[in-house]
Amino acid sequence: MAETVSPLKHFVLAKKAITAIFGQLLEFVTEGSHFVEATYRNPELDRIATEDDLVEIQGYRNKLAVIGEVLSRRHMKVAFFGRTSSGKSSVINAMLWDKVLPSGIGHTTNCFLSVEGTDGDKAYLMTEGSDEKKSVKTVNQLAHALHMDKDLKAGCLVHVFWPKAKCALLRDDLVLVDSPGTDVTTELDIWIDKFCLDADVFVLVANSESTLMNTEKHFFHKVNERLSKPNIFILNNRWDASASEPEYMEDVRRQHMERCLHFLVEELKVVSPLEARNRIFFVSAKEVLNSRMNKAQGMPEGGGALAEGFQARLQEFQNFEQTFEECISQSAVKTKFEQHTIRAKQILDTVKNILDSVNVAAAEKRVYSMEEREDQIDRLDFIRNQMNLLTMDVKKKIKEVTEEVANKVSCAMTDEICRLSVLVDEFCSEFHPTPSVLKVYKSELNKHIEDGMGRNLADRCTSEVNASILQSQQEIIENLKPLLPAGIQNKLHTLIPCKKFDLSYDLNCHKLCSDFQEDIVFRFSLGWSSLVHRFLGSTNAQRVLLGLSEPIFQVPRSLASTPTAPSNPAAPDNAAQEELMITLITGLASLTSRTSMGIIVVGGVIWKTVGWKLISVTLSMYGALYLYERLTWTTRAKERAFKQQFVNYATEKLQMIVKFTSANCSHQVQQEMATTFARLCQQVDVTQKHLEEEIARLSKEIDQLEKIQNNSKLLRNKAVQLERELENFSKQFLHPSSGES
């Protein structure tokens, strides 16, 4: 015949299921705690997860770890109480099918004993407050050990660990607690607090040879005050004694039943009358123990002298065990796991709320960040497009301003060159025709002209140029302002100060007129050289004066040649006439210079022609004029001649650099405006860089927020799955009847 499954397995399965669920729950909350902590401590994600959320979920993680340890140690607990020598230890031994606890004459229990299974093959005991495992081989040795220990008092607990292989009942997480008699102590409250609050079932072992005593009732009244409707069984032990008086058996049984029912229903009010009848049993623990030990040894159950009605008492004991196992398994599952299940659901609800709040905050932040990123991208595109347009406009503006400056400087410099004589006349310094003095004089004159012209040009151009540059810079700044942040706009004038711009004209007169050669030697106005210069000009006069050493009347070959072909009869042109005149005068001058005789001959001819008086008057006037000019050729006159020569020379040289100087000034203006624009562009570049960095930061933040949303949803789905498992656990183990319906 196959053995039926013990109802105690219900608790074992429930414990295994709830332990697994709490293990998953702890793993889930730990994962959620790490997720919330990482989110909270991320400096880039502000206000997504709060410190309160982190503290709360970490607290749940710690609580679940403790609950997991408690669940692993949870077991069904039944406590046996009764008066001294009522047979409590015998009942436990009968249930264990072996003499585990000392019982019988002279072996009363003097302290609390808890019997639980061990996976080892050796029995041992541990006293309260000690971790020492004391080996126990026989029941007598256990009894001897308990009675020899003088430190054991009625309120002490001794753990007896019995091999599970020797006792099937201990394999299903069941702990049986034996107690001293309730009539040996007044410390009932301490007992209850210490040993009864976590008990799932209480068994009152009464002596059927007497009635329920007040000490027994008093104890359970106190238990009922501390616990809400405790599960209480009443065993009327030693019922085999009734076999000696069979005529009174039913009356005695009815009397005990009525008193026990009244105690459970009316006094304690823990069960209904119908349920109470299933909590009261009439047994003989000693008979059952002997019978089961015989059976374990292969002997007949009924061997030995047994009182009449043994089979009925054995069956009732078995009914008690069946009812007890069903009751304790259901009760233990409910008392040990129901509150933890409710607490787990509450934790899941709270964690789900935290995850939902994180998810919502991340979603809102993500939408805001995406909108902000789009705004930043649009602004970056706008700045880039505007910069392209503004760059072309600024280049055009710079070109217009530089051309305007070049024209102004060119006109002003031309006017100043025309007024150069006035500037030279204003120069006063010591003048002397010696080379050393002349060198100093020329150097100072060059400096005077350079300073004067520079000053005059600055007076005429600088203010207008500055106004034009300032206006252009202001226009550029105003056009670029909208592209910069408000904070930079307010500081723009400090970053790009509009300072006064001074043009550098750099005339460099010293080098420009370095090859000037003055001519301040006295020259008579009616002298031969002066006349030649006056009539022929400087270039032709030079040719004539240098040609004195050539042969007399040397004429160009073109005039001496005989034409072989017809020529035009027209008069010679001006160039030919000029060439002929030069040739004749050169020949004449050469003749007069070659011999003084020629002078005498010419003078004689003139003397004969006009007379000596006219010649004398002419020579006198000629000499007087020469003398006048010679006397008036002073240092002052030399200085005037020097200045006039310098003005003519400098005018020619300065006119050559008008275009260069105006171009130089326009280049300076171009550099100034380009530098200003470049500084502004630097600020715009910084702004663009900040925008690019902000866009990159927002993109990273959006990715992180999306990941947070996904993780929070994933964790929430895990929470929902755990809720389903808890619900299934409740239907299967806590409320099986409702689950079936």
UniProtKB/Swiss-Prot annotation:
Keyword Nucleotidyltransferase: no
Segments traversing the membrane: 585-605, 609-629
Keyword Zinc recorded: no
Region (Part of a helix bundle domain, formed by helices from N-terminal and C-terminal regions): 9-73, 338-364, 703-734
Main location: mitochondrion
Domain Dynamin-type G: start-end pairs: 72-321
GO terms assigned for molecular function: GTP binding; GTPase activity; identical protein binding
Membrane association type: Multi-pass membrane protein
Catalytic activity: GTP + H2O = GDP + phosphate + H(+)
Binding sites annotated in the UniProt record for GTP: S85, S86, G87, K88, S89, S90, N237, R238, W239, D240, S284, K286
Region (G3 motif): 178-181
Location of the region described as G5 motif in the Swiss-Prot/TrEMBL record: 266
Tissue specificity statement from the Swiss-Prot or TrEMBL entry: Ubiquitous. In brain, it is expressed at weaker level than MFN2, while it is expressed at a higher level than MFN2 in heart and testis. Expressed at high level in elongating spermatids of seminiferous tubules.
Coiled coil, from the record: 371-408, 677-735
Keywords associated with the record: Coiled coil, GTP-binding, Hydrolase, Membrane, Mitochondrion, Mitochondrion outer membrane, Nucleotide-binding, Transmembrane, Transmembrane helix, Ubl conjugation
The protein's Enzyme Commission number: 3.6.5.-
UniProt record similarity statement: Belongs to the TRAFAC class dynamin-like GTPase superfamily. Dynamin/Fzo/YdjA family. Mitofusin subfamily.
Protein name: Mitofusin-1
Protein species of origin: Rattus norvegicus (Rat)
